[in-house]
Amino acid sequence: MQEIKNMRLISHHDLNGFGNIGEGIHLHQTNDGKRILYMAHESAPKDITGIDVSDLRNPKMLVQTDLAYPHLRSNSLSIIDDIMLVAYQSLEPGQAGTGMGIFDIGNPEEPKRIGFLDTTGPYSRGCHCLWWVDGPYAHLSTGSADFQPRDQKDDQFYMIVDVENPERPVEAGRWWVPGTREGDDEPMPKRHPQFDSGHRLHNA
């Protein structure tokens, strides 16, 4: 039997029973020196959870929010200064509420949504994953209202979003695998006969 080596558990928080954390985890230091661990949830009903881990032996929940729809998930987030970006993806194409939310977390106990990039569309499941580490640009794997894939499995592409003004995010660029979009001149890429999970972007 394997044993834990050179590590020990010093504390635990059950997140009020909602432990379905996805890819979105970010340790944020506030201006007054507190360390807040923000986490995004893989499925409804919860959206984001913030835990004060300044005292590692005594983690305390500061905030836990609810998703707007039961078909959404918020499995990715990124933070710079007091601005947090959250990805919203739906279970099925065409469902409401998908895109990228922008929050002011200056008050860690009351995240305030100040902006939103809507990527809802008939073939879109919204934003799956985002990456934002510096500068004005966020990098998304997402669908959109104006992107129709030839195969529904190819519904996510690479989008660059200008978030310099967090209240008004604007698309700055995009790329997709040539041949996967309706209207492309290129032929559709070959599909794997057994393991075809799509020619779509997972992480940006």
Stretch-by-stretch model annotation:
Residues M1-A204:
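Feature marking well-ordered beta-strand scaffolds used for ligand recognition
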